[in-house]
Amino acid sequence: MTALSTISSVYGPVDSWRVGKSLGIDLIMNTSTCSFNCTYCQLGFIQDITKERKLFISTEKIINDFNLSKWKEADIITFSGSGEPTLAINLGEVITKIKHITDKPIAILTNGTLLINQEVRNNVLNADLISVKLDAPDDKTLKEINRPADGVTLHSIILGIKELKSDIKDLNKSTKLQIQIMFMPQNKNQIESLAKLLNEIKPDEVALNTPTRPYPAGWDIITRGAHGEDTKKIKFPIKPLKTLSLEEAKNIENKLRELTNLQIISVYKN
């Protein structure tokens, strides 16, 4: 495993099909920690599956790392890294401090499990883009694909997303709400059910994705931003994941457009 004492909490910029050159902010770092344990996660099998919020990395270190980073080369600053960013209790504080340094847009990639918590929603509302994962239309599929922490249900996730959207409207925020769907063999035939949820939520945008990075057998911090040639630096064996064909992806996109009339972007278009 990489010596963490020499690793920055800020990495990149890396190329992202969704947002361009993205500078990553890792609020967790020391171990992979998430309220999901997705079967396709680029971090591999999550070491700490939890819903408990805490301080992982001090705000001071993160801001110091940010100032030393190549942030001026980035198009956007993205909170992702070694797990679920909303688990970090200093998420909101870090966002505020970074906004004092730069006006570059800030994105948060989240699985939505903690959005039911008002404090968490307050933490994320100053972001410019909140991208929420939604791969499953029911609890059975949620457990198959996302393997959530105990107590997490699809109902609680959907309710949290709706509350977030309501907060954005009530506070007159310009925050963009995106729903990201990772299509896998387990959910590719559930388009109608997912479309129904999307019509309930009415996000500003839907991002269709399929795994583009392999699933490592173990965790190494390099996996938080590994793309292309970088995946060869991972010290653990990696397992390629089955993805959708271009034809399947086009059919899914066309069907979702037909059923939702929402703004849709797709990894296959980039």
Please annotate each region the language model reported.
Residues T2-R18, M29, N64, N187-N270:
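Auxiliary Fe-S-binding modules of radical SAM enzymes
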Residues L4, W17-I57:
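Canonical Radical SAM [4Fe-4S] cluster-binding loop centered on the CxxxCxxC motif
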Residues L27, F79-G81, I181-F183:
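Short glycine-centered, acidic/aromatic-flanked micro-motifs in structured strand/loop junctions
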Residues C38, A74, A127-D128:
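Short, well-ordered alpha-helix to beta-strand connector turns
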Residues G44-F79, E93:
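Conserved alpha-helical substructure of the radical SAM core
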Residues K51-K54, E144-G151, I222-T223, I238-K242:
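Short glycine-enriched, charge-decorated loop/helix-capping segments at active-site entrances
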Residues E73-A74, F79-G81, I98, I106-A107:
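Glycine/small-residue-rich loop that forms an oxyanion/phosphate-binding "nest" at active or ligand-binding sites
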Residues T86-I222:
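Conserved AdoMet/S-adenosylmethionine-binding subsite of the radical SAM
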